[in-house]
Amino acid sequence: MTKSELIETLAQQHAHVPVKDVENAVKEILEQMAGSLSSSDRIEIRGFGSFSLHYRAPRTGRNPKTGETVELDGKHVPHFKPGKELRDRVNESIA
């Protein structure tokens, strides 16, 4: 599901709310989450999961076109850990 599909689905489920308001709400939620992560804050949504940053150490990579080795810097990457309720719900629907 893309962001625009999410906005469309929410707008259909809440027909009394203007689509522009739904779009602004979704964008604001995502912006707040991105801001929290960029400040190294952990985000926990009970029953859904948590977002945090994981550090990837520097490493030697390879350019796939030339085969040349390249030194890659260490960096922080967003990580999502699903909560138990989400894991259970997904497993029930797939099984």
Swiss-Prot record:
What PROSITE patterns does its record include?
Answer: HISTONE_LIKE
What's one GO BP annotation on this UniProt entry?
DNA recombination
Q: Report if keyword Phosphoprotein is assigned.
A: no
Instruction: Give the CDD domains listed for this entry.
Output: IHF_B (cd13836)
Q: Which GO terms describe its cellular component?
A: chromosome; cytosol
- Please provide the record's keywords in A-Z order: DNA recombination, DNA-binding, Transcription, Transcription regulation, Translation regulation
Compositionally biased region (Basic and acidic residues): 72-95
Listed GO MF terms: DNA binding; structural constituent of chromatin
Region described as Disordered: spans on this chain:
56-95
What NCBIfam families does this protein map onto?
A: hip, PRK00199.1
- Family statement drawn from the similarity comment of this UniProt entry: Belongs to the bacterial histone-like protein family.
- Quaternary state and interactors: Heterodimer of an alpha and a beta chain.
Question: What is this protein's function?
Answer: This protein is one of the two subunits of integration host factor, a specific DNA-binding protein that functions in genetic recombination as well as in transcriptional and translational control.
Specify the protein name.
Answer: Integration host factor subunit beta
Instruction: Name the species this protein comes from.
Output: Pseudoalteromonas translucida (strain TAC 125)
